[in-house]
Amino acid sequence: MKNKPKVIFIYNPTSGRGRVEKNLDFIIGEISAKYGMCDVIRTMSPEHLTESVRESCYKYDYLFFSGGDGTFNMVVNAIPDIERLPVFGFLPGGTTNDMSYNLGISRRNVRKGVHDLLNAEPKRYDVGYIGDTKFIYVADLSSYINAIHITPKSEKKKWGPLAYVYYLLMAFAHSKEYVVYLNGVKYITPMVIISNSKEVASFVINKNHKQDEGKYYACIVKKGPLRGLTNIAYLFAFGVKAAYLSKRIEVVEGSILEILTDEKSWDVDGEYVELSFPAICGYSGRSITVLSNRK
């Protein structure tokens, strides 16, 4: 008789306004119906999450977790350097959820998300790094990214793309251009994005990019009107290819990129991190197996 897999669900009870906590019985019931008994850890702090993930990687065949992109980042940075890792399953439950699009799992409804997750297939997903920090989908330098993240969902639903205008204009007042050397080439830019993601800041900018080939792309937005804000808006509205063809951005691709800048504070998977430069970034040489509905 085939042994049932060992399964655990780790979640932050406060993320996503407590939506996961409110649906916990349903979530565990559905996971248990498919895999058998499911253990549960209710994390009390980021340190508790890190410790729980690290220990669970040694014990379980499937590690399900819930939160936002920042939670996903903490998970990949907690993974120990061992040969055999569990299959990871991500249930979106935070304020920023670009990874929900990358994996094809609903972010709008917990029960729909559970259905998507439990019908997904294991897929290889690359883990990136910048300096000593791992990331799952993006590292970027800009005054504007946080403005996009904090735009309330209610306003986005009501006003569509116009909802971002107010927050972007507020960021514009404090915006600046950065001096960045990428692979030895000097750029003066209002925004740098290093990613393997289809979606960044809730915008699909590189829909056909593969996340299991060890390849990363860097978008360097060119200077332009309104300190480059028009070029940034074009990138997020029409995507990497269109912005490159219209000469609004430069694009550098590769598994490994060398970067040098005096700017230490970067957005990494939706959270600000202090980094040291010069740094090597790109494919970490490691991938995880994650449940996904994307081909």
Which ranges hold each PLM region?
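Short amphipathic alpha-helical segments
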Residues: 21-23, 76-79, 101-103, 205-206
